[in-house]
Amino acid sequence: VYGKSVGLVPYIMPGFLLAKKALEVYRANPECEGLILIKHGIFSFGETARESYERMIKLVSLAENRLGKERGRSGVAPESRALAYPAEIAPILRGLCAPSRVDGDCQRMIATYRTTEEIKAYVDGEELSRYSQAGPVTPDHVIRTKPKPLIVPAPEDGRLEPWTSEVEKRLALFQKEYRAYFDIHNRRLETPKIALDPMPRVVLVGGLGLFGLGGSFGAASIAADLAETTVSVVTASERLGKFESIGESDVFDMEYWSLEQAKLGKSKGLPFDGRVVAITGGAGAIGSATAAAFRGEGAEIVLLDINQ
């Protein structure tokens, strides 16, 4: 696709060693217009900001054109069963995926739903259990999405009780596997880490789409945004071959790297974190003031009023 116009930098965790390797690759080919940092992304450069920008557009366009040649519809049979609405299962997923806290309470989660034809094809793909569990499309996604999403079956309309039981089983296995992943990689460190909660941040739902989960609507939206990006990247990769992520030990190092965790901006929780408050008469002065008060205490707000 690129020939000698770019240099290829092998995967190295972000930091001085990666910068040093990038310089080494550049010096070996000083005429290149950019560098592809494997599993990270692409950089372009030039004598001016405009030249650098135009080279980026060119390099990205070449990649898009290459992917376009392989573009085609994913062969997924339409779902013949009547399915439950996303709004019916969202509260179930919110409740089941709420991590326990040391005080015996739980960290309530907000869920946001996404679906497109591409997402539906992805979650209904025959090899979903392979490509969706391969790892993040770029390393730092892991702090928002966890190493892997939770996969749950399509929820049949009127049969949410057995569906919920199946989700509970899959969630228990997800947590068990996350704890094993942590234990395996933590024991090799000189300074052990403290385990994060083992709950998923992305849930793939057969027949419907995906949910992003987080302690706030913002965090849930970021998880969902990254999951959508993952769907697009993996779908494109699978048209050319098979998607591959970084190794599991590299995923762990990134997830538990203090500099990455600092991006989350953790702060002391507020009383209504993870709760949704519906306020009637929300368009009036009292309603809006009430909304502001609850929002100040961490709640996500739904304003309701009569349109007249």
Protein language model features and the residues they cover:
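Conserved acidic E/D residue at the C-terminus of a beta-strand in Rossmann-like folds
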Residues: D305-I306
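Glycine-rich flexible loops
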Residues: V1-V277, A289
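Canonical Rossmann dinucleotide-binding motif of NAD(H)/NADP(H)-dependent dehydrogenases/reductases
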Residues: L270-I301
